[in-house]
Amino acid sequence: MTLQEKYARVILESCLKVDKNQPLFVSYNIERSDFVRIVAKIAFEMGVKDIYFDCSDPYIKHEALLNLEVDELKGLTFWNKKMWDVYAEKDAAFLMLASETPGLMKDVDPEKLSAMTKYAQETRRGFDARRDKSELAWCIAAVPTTAWAEELFKESANPVEDLWNSIFDICSIDRKSVV
């Protein structure tokens, strides 16, 4: 078992405690589709039959924010988070894979970015309310992006691998017994 597989298993079994037949909702950055495939494989092996993938591409969001007005942006599906509420009603386990792209939005109008963040939150109020009442299983787990890794490991020949190794070390993934 690779360290990424072990990390995915720890997230699903120990952090989220996903039950057989429980729906799973995975929010992630498109750059980490490789890790999401590992998560899906393990989830299916655990008996999960319903997985919703909420994929985002920060570079496409960036271009949209630079070129469209707020009303036009609201028509784009990646800011409409209604499926979060749909899966909250199904008592899904929610896995948010956090992947940063440092500095990407620095040239975006802060008011526009704020408006779209607020809109996304408005479209997932059901999820937020149930999460805030601890009625849902949810977990935020870090996965590297190239830009994030290069920002942290400027001198490294393999910054993504180094960031993965840091995550594994922080989470004790490389130890025999993680939990």
What is the predicted role of each segment?
Residues 1-179:
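Active-site bordering "gate/hinge" segments
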